[in-house]
């Protein structure tokens, strides 16, 4: 509930006590439980779209380095939360133009989707990959391939609205 409150109100007061009490413990761990992931997700909502000082961003950055390996040690039922935490992390890294860690997160998401056989977020993952290829690697051909795959997966899951939004986003990115 705290995560939803933070997201809806853009106030970082919701869940602050939880973070104050538990985040340092989570930060020191090598393997995360489902509760740890929920605390991390709350933390990510606290720092998303906000200016953060170097210490807070350092905590985030060190957490991100542990995320790709978590899919190997977690129960398959918990991978959906890990997937969402990784997607949010990619957004934060991209917004801060901190691109170095993103490829390993992409790889982890691909593995999670394969292990769970849940491809609902595959169009979004491919959208992020095309943006990475276009803006970071300056590789238009690879970006085009990810765009086509994103569109295909959105059609396969029957989400016409998502197909439309993906095409709109591609048109905007293509103008750059």
Residue ranges of predicted features:
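Alpha-helical repeat scaffolds
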Residues: 11-27, 52-70, 98-112, 139-151
